[in-house]
From Swiss-Prot:
InterPro entries: FAM161 (IPR051655). Residues 174-193, 766-779, 795-814 have a biased composition (Low complexity). This is Protein fam-161. Keywords: Cell projection, Cilium, Coiled coil, Cytoplasm, Cytoskeleton. Expressed in amphid and phasmid ciliated neurons. Residues 71-87, 194-207, 216-235, 570-583, 594-610, 728-745 have a biased composition (Polar residues). Residues 71-130, 150-255, 569-610, 714-814 are annotated as: Disordered. The gene is famh-161.
C-alpha cells in the first residue's frame, strides 16, 4: 500500500498565522489529524528555510532535532510533561574554519531537569480539551522563585542527598551529554480561577529519576503545596504587586499558544518522527530547531534559556518560491516547558508588540523629493525683489492707516435684500408654479387615459430597431490605397495637433519673466517719462476744510424723481463718431475782430425808408432760413418714417397684423373652395348633358344607313350632273363633322367604320324601301325617348330632346 500523501498546504507565513488563529478560536482542532499534519508541514518548511540560510552563510546544516515527549496522564492528576533533548556534535571535533560568534551553534549547556509542580489536580469531570487549553498562570511563581533568595532548589536523586544536589548541579557538564529536560504539570482553568493569585509554585530542578522515585517526589511535592501557600500568606515579601499580576494575565494567551503548539507537535511526531520541529516565538515567528543556540550556564547565572540572535523571516511568493532574510535585531527566548524567565532579558523583549503579526493598515506617507539645484544669483535677486515688494506694501498699508478719511464699510443691504416683500413674492410665485404643475399633471393623466382608451396605448408599441443603411443600399467599395491615404491623413493630423513639451514652454515663460525682472530697470520707458509744467502744490488743508464745510452745510439729499426721456432715434454718423480719431488739417489763421476797436466812419443818417428796407431784407433772410430748416426737418422726419415702416414691414409681429393676415387667408381659402365647387358642378352638368353611348351608336348607324342609301341613289341617277353631287357631298361632310363635334365632342367615327348590324342591313336592303326606313328610324328614336323618359331627372330629358332634334335634322338632310 502506498503511504498516505500530505494534504496540499499553502506554505507561507500567512497560512501559519491563519492556523494559529483557528486554533485559538477552536481548541478542539488538536484532535483533528489533518490540522496537525498541516501544522507540522509548515514547521518543516520553516526549518528547510533555516537550513537554506545556514548553507548560504557557509555554515553546515546542524543535525539538531528538538523532540517532545508524549503526554503522560497520572491516575491522581493530569500532568503535561515536555522534555526537549538537543543532540549536538562533539566540541572536540576539529573544524576547518572558525565560526563567527553570531553563528556559533555548538552546545553550551549542561543537563538540567526542572519538574514544575502546579496546584492540586482538577476534578475528573473536566474534559481533556479543557485541561489541554488551560491557562498557565505561573509567571508570578517564576519571578518569586528567582527573585527571592530565600527559596531553595530541592533536588532529588536515587544515589545522592538532595542537599548536595544543588552544589553538584553545575559539575556534570564534562561527563554527561548536553541535555535540557523540563517536566511540568498544568492545571485546568477552573482550578486556577479559584486559586489565590498570591500562591507560589515550587520548581524543583533535579537529575533524571526513576519512575517509582518520580511518583514519590510528586506525592511529596503535593504535600508541600499547602505549607508553601501558608508561608506566602504570612510573609509579606512574597506578595506581588498588581502590575505583576496584570503582566501574568497578559502573557497567558501567548503561553497558551506555545503550549498548544508543543502538544500538537507531540501528537504528530508520534506518527511521523522524521519531521523536524521548530519553536513558536513570542513575536509570532517560528524558530526552527537548527537555528536555536544554547548559552552555557554558570553558577552566577539564572537557569537555562536559549536565545536566537538571528531569526529567519520567510515570505512566500504566489508561484511557491520563497525568499528568506535575517532579522538580527530580534532576540527571543526559547520556551523550555513554558518556563519564561523575565530576569536579565534584552531590551527588545519589551518591544515584542512591534513584531507580532498584525493586519497591515496603510498609513499615508510622502516620498522624499530632491530639491532642484537653482541659480544662486537668481534666487538672491528674486528674494531681494520679494522683500522690496513686501516693504512697499507695508509702507502703503501704514500710510493708508494714517490717513484721515477712511471709506465706510459697504452696507449689508447692497448684497442681501433687507426688504422681505421681494422674497415673499418669489416664494408665493414658486408655490403657485408648483400647484399649477400638479394640477396640470393631473389633467394630463386624465387626458392620457381618455386618449389611450380611444386610440390605444401608443407607448406599448415597440419602435423598430436600428436598420443599417447597407440593408437597402449596397456599401461603397473600398477605394484603392485607402490604408496608405488614411495613414498619411492621420500623420498630418497628429503633426497639426502636436505641441511642444510642457517643460519647454514653462522654461521659456520663466526665462522671459526673470529676464524682464532682472533687466527691466535698465530700459527707459518713454510712456512713463512725461514732462509736466512745474506747478506749486495746492494747499490741501484749505481744500479739506472747504469740503468739510460743504458737507456740513449741505441739506439732506432729495429723493430721486424720474424724468421722462426718449432714446436716440438714430445713431450718430461715422464722421461724428470718429471725429476725434481722424487727423484734421490745420485751420488757416484768422485774426479775431471782436476785440478790435471799431473805426469811426461817417455814416449816412438812416431815414424811415431805409429802416423799412432793412426790415424787409431781414424778414426775407429769416424766411429763407426757416424754409431751409423746415426742409431739413421734413426730410429727416420722412426718412425716419420710411425706416420705421420698412422695419415694421420686415418684421410685423403685432397681434392685429396677424389677425388681419389670418382673415385674408381664410377668405382666400373660402373663395378657392367655392371656385372648385363651381367647376365640379359645371363638369357634372356637362357629363349629364352629353349623349349616352347607345344614342351615339344609333345616330352613327342611322348616318351610315343614310350614306349608303345616298350612294345607291347616286349610282341610279347617272344622268344627273356629277359636279352638283360632289358639292352636295362636301356640304354633307361639313355638316356631319359639325354635328359630331357639337353632339359628343370626343367620340369620332372613321369613314370605313362598320358593325355587325350594318351587314344585316345590307342583306335586307333589296326588300327595304324609303318609307319603311324612315319608319324604322322613327321607331329607334321612340325607343330611345322611352328609355330616357323612365329616368326622373330633367337633365336626361333635355339630353333626349337634343338627341331627337339631331336625328330629325339628319333625316331632313337625307
Amino acid at each position: 500500500m502506498a503511504p498516505p500523501k500530505d494534504p496540499p498546504v499553502l506554505r507561507n507565513l500567512q497560512a501559519t498565522a491563519d492556523l494559529l488563529d483557528a486554533l485559538q478560536n477552536d481548541p478542539s482542532l488538536l484532535n483533528d489529524e489533518e490540522f496537525i499534519k498541516r501544522l507540522s508541514i509548515l514547521r518543516q518548511k520553516h526549518e528547510e528555510t533555516t537550513n537554506f540560510l545556514a548553507k548560504k552563510l557557509g555554515a553546515p546544516p546542524l543535525p539538531t532535532m528538538m523532540t517532545s515527549s508524549e503526554i503522560t496522564q497520572h491516575r491522581s492528576s493530569y500532568k503535561v510533561t515536555k522534555s526537549s533533548s538537543c543532540h549536538f556534535q562533539d566540541e572536540a571535533s576539529p573544524s576547518d574554519y572558525q565560526m563567527p560568534r553570531h553563528l556559533d551553534l555548538k552546545p553550551r549547556s549542561s543537563e538540567v531537569r526542572v519538574p514544575v509542580r502546579a496546584a492540586p489536580e482538577p476534578p475528573r469531570e473536566q474534559s481533556w480539551s479543557q485541561t489541554e487549553y488551560a491557562t498557565l498562570a505561573h509567571n508570578q511563581s517564576h519571578e518569586a522563585l528567582y527573585e527571592d533568595p530565600r527559596h531553595q532548589v530541592h533536588a532529588t536523586s536515587s544515589h545522592q542527598n538532595p542537599r548536595h544536589q544543588s552544589s553538584r548541579h553545575h559539575n556534570i557538564e564534562s561527563t554527561a551529554p548536553s541535555q535540557v529536560s523540563v517536566t511540568s504539570s498544568v492545571q485546568s482553568v477552573a482550578a486556577l480561577s479559584g486559586q489565590n493569585p498570591r500562591q507560589q509554585v515550587h520548581a524543583t530542578p533535579s537529575h533524571q529519576i526513576p519512575r517509582h522515585q518520580s511518583s514519590r517526589t510528586h506525592q511529596n511535592s503535593r504535600q508541600q503545596v499547602p505549607s508553601a501557600t501558608s508561608s506566602t500568606l504570612q510573609n509579606p515579601r512574597h506578595r506581588t504587586s498588581s502590575a505583576s499580576r496584570h503582566h501574568s494575565t497578559r502573557n497567558a494567551t501567548s503561553a497558551t499558544v506555545r503550549q498548544i503548539l508543543a502538544n500538537a507537535s507531540t501528537r504528530h511526531l508520534s506518527s511521523a518522527p522524521h519531521i523536524a520541529t521548530s519553536v513558536a516565538m513570542p513575536s509570532g515567528l517560528l524558530l526552527s530547531s537548527s537555528n536555536t543556540k544554547h548559552v552555557a550556564s554558570s553558577k552566577s547565572e539564572n537557569p537555562q534559556f536559549a536565545t536566537s540572535s538571528h531569526v529567519v523571516e520567510e515570505s512566500f511568493l504566489e508561484d511557491g518560491m520563497s525568499t528568506t532574510r535575517e532579522v538580527p535585531t530580534i532576540r527571543d527566548e526559547v520556551v523550555a516547558g513554558d518556563l519564561k524567565l523575565s530576569k536579565n532579558r534584552s531590551k527588545s523583549m519589551h518591544q515584542l508588540s512591534k513584531y507580532t503579526p498584525q493586519v497591515t493598515v496603510p498609513k499615508p506617507f510622502q516620498l522624499s523629493l530632491r530639491k532642484s539645484t537653482g541659480n544662486t544669483y537668481a534666487k538672491k535677486f528674486m528674494s531681494g525683489l520679494i522683500t522690496e515688494k513686501q516693504k512697499l506694501e507695508e509702507d502703503a498699508k501704514k500710510a493708508l492707516e494714517n490717513t484721515k478719511f477712511r471709506a465706510k464699510p459697504v452696507p449689508k443691504s447692497t448684497y442681501q435684500p433687507t426688504n422681505t416683500f421681494a422674497t415673499e413674492q418669489k416664494y408665493v410665485e414658486a408655490m403657485r408654479k408648483k400647484v399649477a404643475a400638479k394640477a396640470r399633471r393631473k389633467f394630463e393623466v386624465q387626458n392620457e387615459m381618455v386618449r389611450s382608451k380611444s386610440e390605444g396605448n401608443l407607448a406599448s408599441i415597440k419602435p423598430l430597431g436600428y436598420v443599417p443603411p447597407s440593408t437597402y443600399i449596397s456599401p461603397i467599395p473600398v477605394k484603392p490605397n485607402a490604408r496608405s491615404r488614411s495613414a498619411t491623413m492621420r500623420a498630418t493630423i497628429l503633426i497639426q495637433e502636436a505641441t511642444t513639451p510642457k517643460g519647454i514652454k514653462s522654461h521659456r515663460a520663466q526665462s522671459n519673466l526673470t529676464h524682464h525682472l532682472r533687466h527691466g530697470r535698465c530700459t527707459m520707458d518713454a510712456s512713463a517719462v512725461s514732462l509736466h509744467r512745474r506747478t506749486s502744490p495746492p494747499d490741501f488743508e484749505k481744500i479739506h476744510a472747504k469740503i468739510t464745510d460743504n458737507f456740513r452745510n449741505t441739506n439732506s439729499k432729495p429723493s430721486t424723481v424720474p424724468i421722462p426721456f426718449k432714446f436716440a432715434s438714430r445713431s450718430k454718423s461715422a464722421t461724428s463718431r470718429h471725429g476725434n480719431c481722424q487727423e484734421q488739417a490745420p485751420k488757416p489763421f484768422k485774426k479775431s475782430t471782436e476785440n478790435l476797436p471799431k473805426t469811426s466812419k461817417n455814416r449816412v443818417p438812416s431815414t424811415h425808408a431805409t429802416q423799412l428796407r432793412e426790415e424787409l431784407n431781414r424778414a426775407k433772410i429769416e424766411l429763407k432760413k426757416s424754409e431751409k430748416s423746415g426742409k431739413n426737418g421734413n426730410f429727416w422726419a420722412e426718412d425716419n418714417k420710411q425706416r420705421i415702416s420698412s422695419f415694421l414691414g420686415a418684421r410685423s409681429k403685432t397681434e392685429e397684423d396677424i389677425a388681419m393676415r389670418t382673415k385674408q387667408k381664410l377668405q382666400q381659402q373660402q373663395e378657392t373652395t367655392q371656385e372648385y365647387m363651381r367647376q365640379l358642378a359645371e363638369m357634372k352638368q356637362r357629363v349629364l348633358n352629353g349623349p349616352l353611348i347607345m344614342e351615339k351608336q344609333t345616330a352613327l348607324a342611322q348616318e351610315h344607313r343614310l350614306k349608303r342609301k345616298f350612294e345607291e341613289r347616286m349610282k341610279s341617277a347617272k344622268g344627273r350632273g356629277i359636279e352638283r353631287v360632289q358639292s352636295q357631298e362636301k356640304q354633307q361632310s361639313i355638316g356631319r363633322r359639325s354635328s359630331e363635334v357639337s353632339g359628343s365632342g370626343t367620340f369620332v367615327v372613321d369613314k370605313g367604320y362598320e358593325e355587325s348590324f350594318e351587314s344585316e342591313d345590307k342583306s335586307e336592303k333589296s326588300g327595304s324601301s324609303t318609307p319603311s326606313e324612315s319608319g324604322s328610324g322613327s321607331e329607334s328614336e321612340n325607343e330611345s325617348r322611352s328609355s330616357r323618359s323612365s329616368k326622373p331627372k330633367s337633365s336626361k330629358s333635355t339630353s333626349s330632346k337634343s338627341s331627337s332634334s339631331r336625328s330629325t335634322s339628319s333625316s331632313s338632310e337625307a
